Structures are given as structure tokens and as C-alpha cells.
């Protein structure tokens, strides 16, 4: 099924996933297209951050769903 991942800049990335795919796999697909390491990605759907080890189906993600990508940048001195 096709879903979209929307970045903070408004860019939409189309990704083909299976409902059984874990969120980690979706992050890996985003990395393939955008070069953003999964460790720096936070995917939000329905106002909730999704855990890497859960399948897309657990969050009721369906074809046409739009996930929001937020970058988890680590700060430091």
C-alpha cells in the first residue's frame, strides 16, 4: 500500500509498505530516499510518535495515510 511521509519542509515522500512492516522498516525506506539515518527520524501519525518495533497496522495506517517526519537532532556543547 502507498503511504506518504511529509517532512517539515512540506516535501512528501511516497513509500510502498505492507501493513505488517514495522515502523523501523518505514524509517529505512525514508533513509533510502532521503539519506536521513533512522536514528534521527521520529515518525508521527495521529498525533502520536510511533515505536520502531511495532507494525504499521497497529497504528491503523492505511493506503493514503500521511505520516509526519520530525528530525531528532542531538544537541550538545
Swiss-Prot record:
There is a cross-link at residue 76 (Glycyl lysine isopeptide (Gly-Lys) (interchain with K-? in acceptor proteins)). GO terms for cellular component: cytoplasm; cytosol; nucleus; SCF ubiquitin ligase complex. It is found in: Nucleus. Keywords: Isopeptide bond, Nucleus, Ubl conjugation pathway. Cleavage of precursor form is necessary for function. Residues 70-72 are annotated as: Interaction with ube1c. This is Ubiquitin-like protein NEDD8. It comes from Dictyostelium discoideum (Social amoeba). The lineage of its organism: Eukaryota, Amoebozoa, Evosea, Eumycetozoa, Dictyostelia.
Amino acid at each position: 500500500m502507498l503511504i506518504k511521509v511529509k517532512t517539515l519542509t512540506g516535501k512528501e515522500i511516497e513509500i510502498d509498505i505492507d501493513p505488517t512492516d514495522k515502523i523501523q522498516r518505514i524509517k529505512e525506506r525514508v533513509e533510502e530516499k532521503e539519506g536521513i539515518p533512522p536514528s534521527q527520524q521520529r515518525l508521527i501519525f495521529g498525533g502520536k510518535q510511533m515505536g520502531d518495533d511495532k507494525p504499521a497496522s497497529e497504528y491503523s495506517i492505511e493506503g493514503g495515510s500521511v505520516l509526519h517526519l520530525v528530525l531528532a537532532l542531538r544537541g550538545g556543547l
